[in-house]
Amino acid sequence: MSKKQRLSEEDGEVEIELDLGLSLNGRFGVDPLAKTRLMRSTSVLDLVVNDRSGLSRTCSLPVETEEEWRKRKELQSLRRLEAKRKRSEKQRKHKACGGEEKVVEEGSIGSSGSGSSGLSEVDTLLPPVQATTNKSVETSPSSAQSQPENLGKEASQNIIEDMPFVSTTGDGPNGKKINGFLYRYRKGEEVRIVCVCHGSFLSPAEFVKHAGGGDVAHPLKHIVVNPSPFL
């Protein structure tokens, strides 16, 4: 057990501990330099306590811009799906129809004369379209490599047969030869000729005028079918 005794001095009251410990200053439990020592100061005012809260997510784009980017991506994906659906529907309709597209059918033929004379002129102008049939033929490995080339040639020939090359020469003072090809059309549609020099869709009467000719009663008589340079 330790006892404490209070003594009055000039500096004030000093608390002395009486125990069995040794003291180098001659007085038990008294440190004469206790009041002269400086208090330790620190540059840190308060201790920083980390509450370990989750860090906020950072990104290179603002929040609004990121939301707009996501919406744009969703719209693009929806447009792609819509385009794929339309292509599949077109292919399905084309297969259902069997690809039946006639180059010459009854309909309005530009600004030509009567319907009966116009139809007879178109029939004499265009070559007959041959129907292509698919035949299963056993091929060797060497001939199998040439199948893509043959298919490409057949496709180009079918296109050329459907859209033959035509030309006309104007009989006016500024007459010149104009080349083009007959653009395929369906039943009830107007005959159109694509001008090679400008890429314009013209009626037979406009095609003759484009070559420098005047107004003619039967413009199809002035248009000549030429052999294709690709055959």
Swiss-Prot record:
Disruption phenotype: Exhibits hypersensitivity to salt and slight hypersensitivity to glucose abscisic acid (ABA). Residues 130-152 have a biased composition (Polar residues). InterPro entries: Ninja_fam, Ninja_motif, NLS_NINJA_AFP-like, TDBD. Induction: Up-regulated by abscisic acid (ABA), glucose and salt. It is found in: Nucleus. One of its GO terms (cellular component) is nucleus. Keywords: Nucleus. Residues 83-152 are annotated as: Disordered. Its main location: nucleus. One of its GO terms (biological process) is signal transduction. Residues 83-96 have a biased composition (Basic residues). Signal peptide: none annotated. It holds the Pfam family EAR. Forms a heterodimer with AFP2. Interacts with ABI5/DPBF1, DPBF2, AREB3/DPBF3, EEL/DPBF4, ABF1, ABF3/DPBF5 and ABF4/AREB2. Belongs to the Ninja family. Acts as a negative regulator of abscisic acid (ABA) response and stress responses. This is Ninja-family protein AFP3. It comes from Arabidopsis thaliana.
